[in-house]
Every structure is written in structure tokens, then in C-alpha cells.
Amino acid sequence: MSFDPKGYVSFETALSAQGVLDDLIHAVKIATAGDDRVQLIPGVGRVEWVALPDDLLFGHVPGTSLDFPGMRIASPEKALCDLMWLCESRGFAVPWESLRLDDLDRGALEATASRMGLTIRT
């Protein structure tokens, strides 16, 4: 990707890229300390920046050569917790029925959820 995201790929985008979410994704969602915004990026498409509190911006690793090279991407457990936080804070439901949770690291998921003040209800 040829832009500076000022954050890391997360939410449904990271979950889909890592095989945890079955749904087709129509935008790249990026967790950021900046403001919420949406932009069409040539060669990328729709990019949505979602503001998270600074203390919740953790748990990301370098993207692979196939998925988001040169960018940071949330671990599957962090992406799920970011999505849970977003749904809880904005008043919509987590798409539990579309998630494949069996391969997630349960310990990492619970630790991340605890650090973010979330409760896992799966």
C-alpha cells in the first residue's frame, strides 16, 4: 500500500485477512489515535480510520508480504477486542456468527480483553 496509515489495520479487516471472519470486507479499517475519517485511496479503495484511546493502541505486528506489506496489523485476538470495543462504544452488535474463534489463542484473547476493560462472551 502506498500511503501512511498513521495507525494499524484492525477490526473486520484484520480478522478477515487472518481467516477469523468469513464476511467479505469492503474497506480497510485502521485503528488510530487520530480522528475518525473515511478516504478513498487510489490503488487501495475505501479506508476508514477509527479513533481508539491511546492506551488501547497496542497488539500489532508487521503485515506480511501478502497482507498489508509495510503496514502494521493487529493480532487476531487484538483485532477481535478492537471490534468488540468499537461495537460496544458505538452501539452495534459483534458479528459472532461470522467469526471462527477456535484457532484464537484463548489466553491472549482474555489478557487483551482484560487490558481493554472488555468481557469475552463467546
Model-identified regions with their sequence ranges:
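Short gly/ser-rich loop at a beta-strand->alpha-helix junction or flexible surface loop bordering the NTP-binding
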Residues: 1-61
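Hydrophobic alpha-helical interaction segments
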Residues: 58-122
